[in-house]
Amino acid sequence: MPKRIPAAKKRAVRGSTSGRPIMALLDLLGRRWSLRIIWELRDQALSSRALRTACDEASPTVLQARLSDLREAGFVELIPASGYRLTELGKDLLETFLPLHRFAERWSKATTKN
């Protein structure tokens, strides 16, 4: 079960003090490397090193900060023997990305045709 983040620990939601869940989620997902980490964990658990490699050598400090954010939000968990993986909630979130991924593929093909 995801931990509830105390109001004092939450980072400000960009441009809003509403505290609405959608704004908090968009703020979390808008942080550097958050979406990429979720995407790279879509098929399997990865160690910190493998995840860093998959994320184009992201800074270890930033990567660990994002992993901490995503763990605290309940999207990622650390399994000692295998590394980081998506939780069930993280997999649910990933499912919401798939239509956008399919659209991005169509958009890419449409905009590269000459």
Regions found by a protein language model. Give the residues of each.
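Charged, amphipathic alpha-helical coiled-coil/dimerization segments
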Residues: 68-113
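N-terminal helix-turn-helix DNA-binding core of bacterial DNA-binding proteins
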Residues: 15-62, 73-75, 84-91
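Membrane-interacting alpha-helical segments
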Residues: 1-9, 54-66
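Amphipathic alpha-helical dimerization/coiled-coil segments
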Residues: 2-9, 16-21, 39, 95-114
